[in-house]
Amino acid sequence: MAEIPTKLPYTTLRAFLTPILLLAFRPKVKGLRHVPATGPCILASNHLSFSDSIFMPLVVPRKVTYLAKSEYFTAPGAKGLIQKLTFIALGQVPVDRSGGRRSEAALLTGLKILAEGDCLGIYPEGTRSPDGRLYKGRTGIARLAMESGAPVIPVAMFNTHQIQPTGKLIPKIKRVRMEFGEPMYFTGDSTDMN
């Protein structure tokens, strides 16, 4: 199971970046009141851009921990080191998405985050949308919700694929929009999903 990073780098990076990014990208946010102030919750968002994991924590008033593909933590060279340190500072946890037992380890990591009363950010599609459309989600989020009892807050991200298209390092300055929906609760036995 992956080790969950400490909150100090996250808090420091957030304090530094938030004023700059809020001023530059002027996020328009609806429904933020649906994110509980305490206790476990799952923020389930569409995934349009690398920058989704940066913009959402800017507006959510509590720490959001994401499950991120392990390749972000293992790239070689100076760029790889900077990328790894940035992802750790952003509160992201590396997970191997290759399937089987590795996928199980990712779910257990998510359950540990929720058991600690934290907020878990997840992209149900499992990867970025190549064209801005919403694709079929995977079942891991349902399992996390049913096994933890945590509410799922649906989140819609808009414009981030235009701000930072796949493969682009430098984002364009454009207004980002986010909408948080009402919490959803799921019950049942997650073993029935197989």
Please identify what each model-predicted range represents.
Residues 16-18, 89-97, 124-127:
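Short, basic, glycine/proline-bearing loop/turn elements
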Residues 1-30, 34-37, 62, 77-90:
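A transmembrane-helix-recognition feature enriched in membrane-embedded lipid enzymes
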Residues 93-116:
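Helix-adjacent hinge/juxtasegments
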